[in-house]
């Protein structure tokens, strides 16, 4: 009887581990030149050969909403059999927002977030067996500025580290058009490069959709008060013009910043989670 109880306790401990972050935070740049400290937190689904998603919270490229657009998203994915990795990619941070010190020193800016996401995908692929993941089925999901980040990975990364699919949710897209989210542009480009036309163009994602772009799941709300919904329209038009497999959902209500919350936004916009799960099953990963 005692032996049975001990075994039951061990099983419960393992289950509890998988119901939270199955592994402690990891520094994806540890052991590399410069020893950059960029943390990623795994939330592993049970089993092996799972699909995985790198979750990139939003925050205007200045900061992160790690709760609603990070850990809550990861737990929801984990409950649905998808392993998730919340990436705290480098951002410009609050002091840069307040002081404009990046006119004098570099600070964090492009391509730092993209380098971090590229490194995260490489890191996960190298440990796919350990994490119980199919290395061919690693996607990326991002919110707001994080949506720009994951879509830039779909367009700009080499094929060996490109996500298998991406889900930009109420994303920042353009850096040039009138609907640009200026705060994100300033954070990503840097104070002394925010008016550089060539750089703006290179990071306006509606202009650079490749013919072999991975599948895209795109969501926005027409009452978004933060990122103009025309950003998503620009991306949808570009994906359609290039015949890229994608699903675009435009909700009338929901605003911005609802992430995977069961209470934020509206009942209408919260349907995106069920729609995403249907969509990812249709990909037959």
Residue locations for each model-derived region?
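Short beta-strand element of the alpha/beta-hydrolase
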Residues: 50-58
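Catalytic nucleophile-loop/oxyanion-hole region of alpha/beta-hydrolase
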Residues: 65-66, 85-135, 265-269
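Primarily recognizes the serine-hydrolase "nucleophile elbow" in alpha/beta-hydrolase
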Residues: 115-183, 200
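Mobile cap/lid helix-loop segments that gate and shape the active-site cleft of serine hydrolases
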Residues: 31, 171-208, 268
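Short beta-strand/loop motif that positions the catalytic acidic residue
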Residues: 212, 218-220, 224
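C-terminal catalytic histidine-bearing segment of alpha/beta-hydrolase fold enzymes
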Residues: 33-34, 38-41, 95-102, 233-285
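Short amphipathic alpha-helix adjacent to the substrate-entry channel of hydrolases
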Residues: 66-85
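N-terminal cap/lid segment of alpha/beta-hydrolase-fold proteins
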Residues: 24-48, 110-111
